Amino acid sequence: MSGAARWWLLSDLHLGMSDDDPRCPGKMLPEFLRSEVLSSSAPQQHVVFVGDTFELAGCAEDESLARLESIFTRHLDAFWALEECAARGVQLHFVCGNHDVELVRPSVAARLSALLSPAGATRVRVYPWLLHVPHVLVAEHGHQHHALHRMPELLRTAVSGTDQLDLPPLAAWNAHRSRSFLGRAVAVARACLASERAERRIRKLEYDELLEAESLRLALDGMALRDLARLSRFRTVTALPVTAVRMVLAAAGRSVAGEAAPASAGRLARTLEAHGSGVAWYVTGHTHRALESALESCPTRYVNTGTWSSDVRGRGPDQSDRGAFPYAVVDVGGDGAVSGGLRYWRPDGG
């Protein structure tokens, strides 16, 4: 990935087997791709989906494949537009989120590539955790920094999906809706203990080998990637009280989330800097709060690409104008200069 290029990054479309979202992200995506991407004259073009592109989580392999086919059938225009992009040389990148973690299963990723780029699978890449463009950007969904969604052994999903992994605490709560409150609480407690055990396992040799292989694939310093894997460690003693406070505030119609970059963004950017792997931009999704911000004690700028679904939680233009769809642009000049930022696309061109 070198030379002049333009990167478009967007997230949290939540395309599923139905199409009942009032913002119609599945219908808006092809319009965006044709008006912004396919009309661009940039010599290299990349579109990055920063997680939760699809509703594809908690499924075994066969069900994951079947769901992907159903999503394809429901959102044909979106998939055809993506196929057109790939056919015209646009590189498509899919970073997995907590809602589409099964996308990285080898068979599912291969099927996605076959659907979007029948003539050349190299045009479609799927990432279990993050995408790294040296000196330019790092993009990840962001759920690894949210304790109740965090999956410490995330890289194992690229081998067998979530088959061998315990559910994160919040997923454990949601997986047992028919149980009593006490039964669901017990499931969460067990998931917390499992997360604590998983945090210890990622510090052992077996997981180090997965990290080393991923660092080579990402062209990212191995020690840097190891340290990133250990950021935002799950700790029950801090996760549950914070969650309880958020639940109480949410019930009262309030939120503790502000409009500034999360502390984890600064920690990640400074970790990269410390290893000589600093980047100009750090991009996430997950929170459904679109924003751009400077980071403390670091030259890296942070962008959250918000959501294209109706569940907008930020205070940006998309809160009052549901026809404003957030995305990030990162331009790399022929001289290596990097620029960009958060943008809003409107179907009417406004």
Regions found by a protein language model. Give the residues of each.
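Extended recognition/assembly regions associated with phosphoester-bond processing machinery
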Residues: 1-350
